[in-house]
């Protein structure tokens, strides 16, 4: 019942936003918001078209570029996501979210070094981006920067102690530092928060503690 109601509400919002775009065809924000609502409704191609229109009207709209990049990433169009996020960074070097997105793209492409560069820039501009600290932990572990991994994991947990993946990554970082008791504590916390901790990791941890 509530799902149908939500869909009806979304359809109503879309209709209102479409009307606003007809009435104000030159409004960047109208097209931008329409794109976001289309995305929420799962109408991805229309979301792309609306955000592209917003960027056509204002090529310097960093927010529209970032949202278009996130949309492309979700659609698996990684190279397009890369291009628009690079465009956003060129316009605004201080955009933490654009740097974070580029880090995720390069991590997805398997380039841990490049990912780390962008993640480092992201938290320099906004130290409270918890997902970036979480991703940085994973990248540092891939590169076997164990001290840095522990530092990044600690920052994530400090920001959001009840973020399940932050607790999991802290457990893994502690494991690689040889602090198995602390690793067990944080793995248990991740499990309690509903995170599907890798069974192989739990087995390895149990073996070290036995």
Predicted regions and their residues:
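TPR/TPR-like alpha-solenoid helical repeat scaffolds
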Residues: 2-5, 172-176, 196-210
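Ankyrin-repeat and related helical/solenoid repeat scaffolds used for protein-protein interactions
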Residues: 131-192, 196
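Boundary/linker segments of alpha-helical solenoid repeat arrays
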Residues: 62-63, 96-97, 130-131, 164-165, ...
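Structural marker of alpha-solenoid helical repeat scaffolds
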Residues: 23, 57, 91, 125, ...
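Conserved alpha-helical positions within TPR/SEL1-like repeat arrays
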Residues: 29-40, 62-74, 97-108, 131-141, ...
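N-terminal coiled-coil initiation/transition segments in long coiled-coil scaffolds
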Residues: 2, 16-23, 29-33, 37
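Structural signature of tandem alpha-helical TPR/SEL1-like repeats
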Residues: 5-19, 41-53, 75-87, 108-121, ...
